[in-house]
């Protein structure tokens, strides 16, 4: 110790020591100072104060040592307010100038400093707490095991796989990547301990099919979400089928209605046939009647031609037309479908520019007027010699409507 102090004084470094202690425990900070009996040595015990950002050391005791004797003057209030331990002092100095501390409160766990001559030694006292069982997690996709500390101080953590220690640390978290090719189904144990107690956690890890395992975990964690998705899909399918059926029936009914409107009524053919029979019976002559020659075509003059028939020929009565059946009452009109909305008018294209007007050709000279010739007289048609005069005949006019 003496050699260490000489070395520290030479390089000007402060020596630091860490102590772990429980609550209500007494700890002694040993000074280990030796000096000659002829020389007196001054010793100072200080405590670190970090209240209100005032990082300074407060003096606890001032001691003088000569040989093996030590006499101190304690400047710190050593009384304890708790009645159960009121007779116990917080700080005491032994005969060799070592400091004894009773750790009755959390505020006592701090840093203390020993100063003598040109030497400084820091003693840091930490509160030692018991440990609890750690947490162990794993990720099959990354082949990762994680051990995490819950409570406890001054701890050591160990990881064992199949009762074989694989890794250890004194930090709060321990991680380890295992080899997939060696094992995927094993038992992992995380153990944590300190000088007070120890605890462990064991978990069976099965990663034979990491992809399937991850899908199973996702399914179990999101089972309620998948249930709502299935209900939504089934409801959508039922609604789509219902809408399709309604649309099909509506289109079928509309098509049938349009066909009934466009198809002609069955009575129209009979009426047209009846009218056609009447017309032919009136205008077409009987086949027994003799046909007289027609000198000119009907289309030439566009006028009806009448012929005379002698009274010696018997008149053939024309057959009367068949009476038409009474018309059937028309069915009530069916309501028309609502008109479709007209599409919006398309914008008119811009007008094309007119081409420039072409120059007019020069006027042609007028031809000389043709001479007028009088019309030729119509040829005289001789009458038949056997026809008596008009005054002695019973003449009837026949309207001939046949085209020669």
UniProtKB/Swiss-Prot annotation:
One of its GO terms (cellular component) is host cell membrane. It is found in: Host membrane; Virion membrane; Host Golgi apparatus. The chain crosses the membrane at residues 226-246. The keyword Membrane applies. It is a single-pass type I membrane protein. Residues 247-404 are cytoplasmic. It comes from the Viruses. Residues 1-16 form the signal peptide. Residues 17-225 are extracellular. Glycans are attached at residues 24, 87, 92, 96, 122, 139, 167, 193, 200, 206. The keyword Translocase does not apply. Keywords: Disulfide bond, Glycoprotein, Host Golgi apparatus, Host membrane, Late protein, Membrane, Receptor, Repeat, Signal, Transmembrane, Transmembrane helix, Virion. Sequence repeats lie at residues 322-327, 328-333, 334-339, 340-345, 346-351, 352-357, 358-363. Disulfide bonds join 140-207, 147-190. Induction: Expressed in the late phase of the viral replicative cycle. Residues 357-388 have a biased composition (Pro residues). Residues 273-287 have a biased composition (Basic and acidic residues). Cleaved into two fragments of 63 kDa and 26 kDa containing respectively the glycosylated N-terminus and the nonglycosylated C-terminus. A full-length 89-kDa glycosylated form also exists. Residues 322-363 are annotated as: 7 X 6 AA tandem repeats of [KN]-P-C-P-P-P. Residues 260-295, 357-390 are annotated as: Disordered. May play an immunosuppressive role by inhibiting lymphocyte proliferation and subsequently facilitating viral replication and generalization of infection. Responsible for viral hemadsorption, which may help viral spread. Increases virus replication in the tick vector at the step of virus uptake or replication in the tick gut. May play a role in the host Golgi reorganization to yield viral factories. May play a role in host cell penetration. Both glycosylated and nonglycosylated forms interact (via C-terminus) with the host AP-1 complex. The C-terminus contains repetitive amino-acids that may function as a cell-penetrating peptide. Belongs to the asfivirus CD2 homolog protein family. This is CD2 homolog.
């Amino acid at each position: 110790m003496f050699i260490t102090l000489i070395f520290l004084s030479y390089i000007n470094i402060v020596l630091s020591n860490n102590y772990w202690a429980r609550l209500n425990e007494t700890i002694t900070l040993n000074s280990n100072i030796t000096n000659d009996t002829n020389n007196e040595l001054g010793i100072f015990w200080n405590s670190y104060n970090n209240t209100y950002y005032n990082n300074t050391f407060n003096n606890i005791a001032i001691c003088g040592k000569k040989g093996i004797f030590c006499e101190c003057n304690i400047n710190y209030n050593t009384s304890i307010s708790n009645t159960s331990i009121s007779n116990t002092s917080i700080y005491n100095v032994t005969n060799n100038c070592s400091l004894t501390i009773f750790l009755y409160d959390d505020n006592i766990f701090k840093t203390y400093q020993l100063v003598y001559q040109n030497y400084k030694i820091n003693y840091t006292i930490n509160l030692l707490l018991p440990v609890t069982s750690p947490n162990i997690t794993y990720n099959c996709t990354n082949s990762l095991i994680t051990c995490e500390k819950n409570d406890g101080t001054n701890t050591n953590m160990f990881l064992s796989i199949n009762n074989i220690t694989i890794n250890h640390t004194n930090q709060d978290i321990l991680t380890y990547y295992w080899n997939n090719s060696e094992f995927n189904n094993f038992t992992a144990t995380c153990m944590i301990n300190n000088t007070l107690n120890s605890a462990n956690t064991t978990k069976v890890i099965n990663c034979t099919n990491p992809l399937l395992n991850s899908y199973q975990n996702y399914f179990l964690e999101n089972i309620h979400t998948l249930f709502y998705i299935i209900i939504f899909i089934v409801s959508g399918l039922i609604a789509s089928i219902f809408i399709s059926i309604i649309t099909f029936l509506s289109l079928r009914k509309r098509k049938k209605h349009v066909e009934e409107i466009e198809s002609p009524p069955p009575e129209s053919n009979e009426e047209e046939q009846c009218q056609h029979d009447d017309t032919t019976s009136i205008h077409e002559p009987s086949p027994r009647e003799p046909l007289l020659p027609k000198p000119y075509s009907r289309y030439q003059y566009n006028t009806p031609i009448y012929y005379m028939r002698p009274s010696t020929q018997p008149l053939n009565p024309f057959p009367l037309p068949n009476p038409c059946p009474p018309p059937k009452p028309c069915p009530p009109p069916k309501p028309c479908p609502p008109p479709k909305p007209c599409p919006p008018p398309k914008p008119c294209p811009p007008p094309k520019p007119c081409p420039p007007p072409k120059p007019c050709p020069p006027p042609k000279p007028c031809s000389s007027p043709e001479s007028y010739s009088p019309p030729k007289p119509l040829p005289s048609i001789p009458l038949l010699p056997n026809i008596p005069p008009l005054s002695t005949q019973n003449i009837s006019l026949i309207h001939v409507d046949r085209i020669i």
